[in-house]
Amino acid sequence: MRAWTWDLFCRVIDNWGDVGVCWRLARDLAARGARVRLWIDDASALAWMAPGGSEGVEVGAFDAALEPGDVVVEAFACDPPPAFVERMAARTPAPVWINLEYLSAEPWVERVHGLRSPQRSGLDKWFFHPGFSAATGGLLREPGLLAAHAAFDRDAWLAASGLARRDG
């Protein structure tokens, strides 16, 4: 079975939080065997955030996106370039188009996660809302995180840091 190609579109809006979320998603997908292309309008944050890059993640300029892959993710409603959307509509089968929204614990998120949004192009866009309940998209979690958390020795870390534990 061939690996799916994922195109992630990201516009840096404020303090690089957007690219941080997209970078984590790109790394996670690549670690699962997907081919990932991150199309970003300001890659300067990656110079300090991920100076070595990540195996399986290709980074390109936002407006330089080529032929659409199998899945297109627009982070935080950033809309892929119009010419790219035209190529999406011409592709058979059409790619799955996902609008990745911000993390929220608000109750309304459960009602809109997974909703279809028909587009002028004839394509459907699907809302993906990360969240904290089974009715949302959940959270990204690095492999081994729970085991590392369980093995963490707070007292030893504090002692090694020259800090004393305080109750409260």
Model-derived regions: residue spans:
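Positively charged, low-complexity intrinsically disordered leader regions
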Residues: 1-6, 130
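Residues that mark the start of a beta-strand
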Residues: 5-7, 167-168
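Active-site and donor-binding regions of nucleotide-sugar-utilizing enzymes
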Residues: 7-122
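A nucleotide-sugar donor-handling region in carbohydrate enzymes
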Residues: 102-168
